[in-house]
Curated annotation (Swiss-Prot):
Homodimer. It comes from Pelotomaculum thermopropionicum (strain DSM 13744 / JCM 10971 / SI). Signal peptide: none annotated. This is 2-isopropylmalate synthase. Its cofactor is Mn(2+). Its EC number is 2.3.3.13. Mn(2+) binds at D14, H202, H204, N238. Belongs to the alpha-IPM synthase/homocitrate synthase family. LeuA type 1 subfamily. HAMAP family: LeuA_type1 (MF_01025). It catalyses: 3-methyl-2-oxobutanoate + acetyl-CoA + H2O = (2S)-2-isopropylmalate + CoA + H(+). GO terms for biological process: L-leucine biosynthetic process. InterPro entries: 2-IPM_HCS-like (IPR050073), 2-isopropylmalate_synth_dimer (IPR013709), AIPM/Hcit_synth_CS (IPR002034), Aldolase_TIM (IPR013785), LeuA/HCS_post-cat (IPR054691), LeuA_allosteric_dom_sf (IPR036230), LeuA_bact_synth (IPR005671), PYR_CT (IPR000891). CDD domains: DRE_TIM_IPMS (cd07940).
Amino acid sequence: MSQRVYIFDTTLRDGEQSPGVSLNVGEKVQIARQLAKLGVDIIEAGFPITSPGDFKAVSEIARQVKGVTVAALARANFQDIDRAWEAVRHAEQPRIHTFIATSDIHLKYKLRMSREEVLDAAVAAVKRARAYTGDVEFSAEDASRSDLDFLCRVLAAAIEAGATVINIPDTVGYAVPEEWGKFINTIYHKVPGIEKVIVSVHCHNDLGMAVANSLAAVMNGARQVEGAINGIGERAGNAAIEEMVMALYTRKDQYNLYTNIKTEEIYRTSKLVSALTGMKVQPNKAVVGKNAFAHEAGIHQDGVLKERTTYEIMNPAMVGISKSNLVLGKHSGRHAFRHRLEEMGYNLSDEELNSAFERFKKLADKKMEITDEDLEAIIEEEMRLVPHTYTLEYLHISSGTTVVPTATVGLKRDGQLMEEAACGNGPVDAICKAIDKITGLNCTMTSWGINAVTAGKDALGDVSLKVTADGEKVYVGRGISTDVLEASAKAYVNAVNKLIWDSQK
């Protein structure tokens, strides 16, 4: 049996099903490119039948992202499968991922099908997909709650029909590691032909055991694990890819397995996904959380200073957390700026570099020292792939304990300056109302949050907010500035630009 574990990333499909997450096509392509750079083996780009937007995202990723298998999801029916192939056909390595539920509860209440009907549908779906491509993955939805004998019949039939990957999902996060490992082991011994295919698992985190269950499956023969960056996904999320990868890497003595992941890209990938989805990473999150390599207790600090391995089982550099001593400031030139960005893994076009350098110089006038975190924030803001319908020109605020908060905002559109003023329940509310007056939109802000990019009085504030115009589709906006209110205005304009761009497509 191969010692390689394939990494199947579903950030753009299952991950995007997280409540409040809505990515546009450009953002999905940007994440897909970074996933390819990270070294994932398969990117599940979306579910093409569900919407024109999903179809376009899968199609664009298939055309633009190279060196990786691109998968499209489809239910076990011909219409879904045909649509999936139409979207993914231009990929260098296309895969159709088709699924049907096998648990009695799903058969009775969702599908309203008999076991034999499900078996026939699975076989027909795999054959249809194989007519298009030699790479077909079959998933038995809710496998962990399925009758084992029936599940094995379906898996055997799917293999005989031509499936090359057999995925066994713990769809509702019901399994526990010891049980799940035995479950996978039993399937290996009961399903004819299973040695000819790659066995995969897709574990959810409802009981907090998605990563543990995935690793238990690997110990029992699974050679593909499915998950999402930062563990995002429906309900409590998916298995976190960064945690599975670093567990396999750090505990080679236990697993004796490897992946093709470039671990130094993990942190940058995590930050990109967090920035574009608006889902913040909890500070104590394993591997990529803000506190993952922080030591506050005096004994721990003393130990780490004397010898890092006393309290750190991973080197921060392994996952791409930089400890560079190079500090940039207002006297730093374009060459030093470009050099540092290249060291950090960013390769910008001349146009992007010029724009980013202008932002850097403006920030350097306000901050004495520019850190890597500041640079990352600048680049993330620069690389947002939405046309700037409106740009913030200026902002004046009047606020206080005895004054009604008032904001005067100036925006530019097509070179024309537009100004409006508004009062609000607070300065941020006043800013948003003034912007709505200019744009003619009536948006509702559903969340607002700020992170300090670095420490100190002159720290950059990174504001992330979510807005909706119809109560359904949510748009994430981000803005950075040393001024919290300016960052809020930038974030709101960013969200509004996304909304306008989406409505014009």
